[in-house]
Regions:
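Rossmann-like NAD(P) dinucleotide-binding subdomain of oxidoreductase/dehydrogenase enzymes
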Residues: 1-129
Length: 129
């Protein structure tokens, strides 16, 4: 809907393939859900790297969401990777097969994430604190 007369606006969603989500310890499920469900609606799969302080929460949420998706005919949409943040995070932001990475974390790490992803012409969403 446009406020200008005779003006039309269109929104198109295109699948990117794989979306990476790196979330912090605070609100890990909310941050992941904001990104993951939009990506799933667009036809993407999601790899989630939660904070190492909330692994059980991440695994439980991922299992519940995958169960719901599978009951509706969609398999393998959400994956969670638990482990050392710098090792796994570096793999996600350097992987050219992951065109979009959403990052929540410190400003210093956000700069590093931005530079790395920009170097491979990827896209990033950041929520910095």
């Amino acid at each position: 809907h446009s406020e200008r007369p005779l003006h039309r606006m269109y929104e198109q969603w295109h699948s990117l393939g794989i979306v990476g989500v790196i979330s912090a310890f605070n609100f890990p499920v909310a941050v992941w859900a904001w990104n993951a469900f939009i990506a799933a609606i667009a036809g993407d799969t999601v790899i989630w790297k939660p904070s190492s302080s909330v692994p059980l929460t991440a695994i439980a949420v991922q299992n519940i969401c995958n169960e719901v998706m599978e009951k509706n005919g969609y398999t393998g949409i959400f994956s969670v990777v638990i482990g050392n943040g710098s090792t796994i995070g570096e793999r996600l932001i350097n992987d050219p097969n992951i065109p979009l990475v959403s990052f929540t974390g410190s400003c210093n790490m956000g700069k590093h994430v931005s530079k790395t992803i920009a170097g491979r012409f990827g896209k990033t969403f950041k929520q910095l604190f």
